[in-house]
Amino acid sequence: MPGHKGRGPLGCEELDITEIAGADELYEAEGIIAQSEANATQLFGTARTYYSTEGSSQCIRAMLHLALQMQPAKAGRPVLLAARNAHKALLYAAALLDFDIQWLWPAPDAAGALCTCHVEPEALASALDELAAEGRTPFGVYLTSPDYLGFVQDIAGLSAVCHAHGLPLLVDNAHGAYLHFLKEGSRHPIQLGADLCCDSAHKTLPVLTGGAYLHLGPSVQADEAAVRNALALFGSTSPSYLILQSLDAANAVLADSFREKLDICRWRLGMLCRELDALRPGLALPLTGAHREPLKLTLDAAALGLSGQQLAQALRERGVECEYADPRYVVLMPSAESSAAEFACLQTALHAICDEAPAADVSVAADDPAAFAALAGALEAQPRRFTIREAVLAPQEMIPAAEAVGRICAAPAV
């Protein structure tokens, strides 16, 4: 193996190797992979950093498995306290590992944003106290930061609450691998107090799709074998060496020119946002502030009298492909590798759309906080019929959403 023998139409086949002598083995690393991971550990300033070739999804399952192993033995089903905007990888992990989830719901004024669930430290402390009063101590707290719309949690404050309750904080930082390399200092979750954290290197760093990191903070006592076994449990026995080489090559970039290129990208993005603010106030969400990340352009299509999907289609027709669109928002993700020409293309497209869009007072329907609060309360009040594992693995059928009232959702709907 491999069957292509280093030859083929793509041109990269000679680099696509397997666990041959000298190439090391990802889940039993002792040679060049272990050394490369040690280099990444030093670059990110973590206690330990491990590679994944199957994205943050593999890392999420592994870190939840580790957190379950770390909890003291106790009666009852394990429960995780998690913000409701979690990626579906968390739900699949709950099905595989068979734990329950107690949700932290977003504030009512976030009703129109499926991807956002801001959690205040006081709210987290209250939720933990309520669980304790019920005799249910979670094995950890799970947050997504940054989220898809570019909002970040108060990781420092929230980690302090977790640690005061003797719990680990797990952070899905899939969109924030670059946060350690900001010129003003690291805003990476591990430096802010998270215990376990995943980064999708491929989302914001010069790494092939699938390349990711599992980071451990200094408080995590799991030994080397336990961490590698956790990753192996959820990974292919044939990890991609192309992706591993990409992760290794990124170390040199991160140690050399990345911070400067990242700063240039942020400057270009800031200039564009200021232009958009002048054209259509409220179109671009802020890039600065304690609860915003600086490398995600989130557009509120309501400022143009459009839906998010309409704005995304208008951009697509002008040669710009968006990362995400929903009924209200559009998300674009530049990186340190984005060129001046690409920013110019985006600028031209947005100027044209602003010129053609309806008056700014035409907007999508406003969110109804009261209706959202009622919905969240009704969902929480429903008796549980199945565990997540039972629902995901049960026989299923596809039906129209209008006919789903009173039925049990068998898989993530987003």
Where are these regions (language model features)?
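Short, flexible, solvent-exposed loop/turn segments with mixed acidic/basic and small polar residues
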Residues: 38, 65-66, 286-290, 320-325
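Short glycine-rich or small-residue beta-strand-to-loop segments that form or flank ligand, phosphate
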Residues: 23, 50-52, 141-144, 298, ...
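Conserved PLP-enzyme active-site core in the AAT-like
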Residues: 10, 16, 35, 46, ...
